[in-house]
Amino acid sequence: MNDYTQQLQGKKDYLKTLFAGLDVPEWEVYESPDKHYRMRAEFRIWHEGGEMFYAMFEKGQKASGASLIRCDRFDAASEAVNCLMPELIAVAAQSAELRNHWYAVEFLSTLSGEMLVTMIYHKRLDDEWMKAAQALQQQLDISVIGRSRGQKIVLKQDYVTETLRVGDRDFHYRQIEGSFTQPNAAVCRKMLEWACRAAEGLGGDLLELYCGNGNFTLPLSRYFRQVLATEISKTSVSAAQWNIEANWIGNIKIARLSAEEFTEAYTGKREFTRLKESGIVLTDYAFSTIFVDPPRAGIDEETLKLVSQFDNIIYISCNPETLRANLDTLTETHTVGRAALFDQFPFTHHIESGVLLKKKIL
């Protein structure tokens, strides 16, 4: 058993133990590549003895020379990131404007090799920095953003466009710097395909909470008459709207509401101008299914009451412990029809999982 297989087996065993006592079917397991799976990476820039290099630090340790890990390459990151790392630091080292007070760097790449680099500084960025950064951007064929306290300078664009094939169709996603996106594109594609298989034959309308940039929304829209998706982040809502239009999808509407706010609107406790302004009338929908992909804290108690009203629940979780706690409630009214482990974060303790629940027939 190699290192990757061993760590994955540990995650399977953990889930079986955690969900013992619940009637959960055999876990479907979706593996990750064991190298070059992360589309995002971030490093400190360490300056020492006239040299600078990429660095990380021992987990739980204060950032210092004692805890420093030099990173001339980073096998977890995409091949595009690894190819760019030495070129970027070599070019930046030749320019005092780029080199001085350069504190950290963030890479955001795509499967096609498109690259956005955010260079973070402990100094004010001026016109001289912009000239040097524009030359770097052109030389390396990348997009560059400069950040410092109170400053964000976008030289070309602040996003990349990822393309993921799901079933027989390509979906194009604008991924904006600083916004959440699934870091492991290969496993993300498997998650999308699993969710689509779970949705097959359900019909009716879909409600999605916590939709982000529309990652799941776009492919799932093919399986429902109408989709209403909610998201609180303005940046994510903007990206989701762009993604919907770019993919020529006509049956999705986005409501800029938190899950808690939508619960208030859906139950009639409160009216929201944002819904009216978006032309969204909740009584126009006949929801058969709810899709949720909540933050690590899981679903709050009031939203959980809302979720339990739907015939079908597709639940993607980034925290199996809060999923287990939520299932203790949801399995009072629903049965678990499918369960999946997605190894989105190899060689870490983090586990991404998904379940399909169907309402019990009384």
Swiss-Prot record:
It comes from the Bacteria. Its EC number is 2.1.1.-, 2.1.1.35. S-adenosyl-L-methionine binds at Q182, Y210, N215, E231, D293. Belongs to the class I-like SAM-binding methyltransferase superfamily. RNA M5U methyltransferase family. TrmA subfamily. It catalyses: uridine(54) in tRNA + S-adenosyl-L-methionine = 5-methyluridine(54) in tRNA + S-adenosyl-L-homocysteine + H(+); uridine(341) in tmRNA + S-adenosyl-L-methionine = 5-methyluridine(341) in tmRNA + S-adenosyl-L-homocysteine + H(+). CDD domains: AdoMet_MTases. One of its GO terms (cellular component) is cytosol. HAMAP family: RNA_methyltr_TrmA (MF_01011). The active site is at C318, E352. SUPFAM superfamilies: S-adenosyl-L-methionine-dependent methyltransferases. InterPro entries: MeTrfase_TrmA_AS, SAM-dependent_MTases_sf, TrmA_MeTrfase, U5_MeTrfase_fam. One of its GO terms (biological process) is tRNA methylation. This is tRNA/tmRNA (uracil-C(5))-methyltransferase. It is an enzyme of class 2 (transferase). It comes from Neisseria gonorrhoeae (strain ATCC 700825 / FA 1090). Disulfide bonds: none annotated. GO terms for molecular function: rRNA binding; tRNA (uracil(54)-C5)-methyltransferase activity, S-adenosyl methionine-dependent; tRNA binding. Dual-specificity methyltransferase that catalyzes the formation of 5-methyluridine at position 54 (m5U54) in all tRNAs, and that of position 341 (m5U341) in tmRNA (transfer-mRNA). Keywords: Methyltransferase, S-adenosyl-L-methionine, Transferase, tRNA processing.
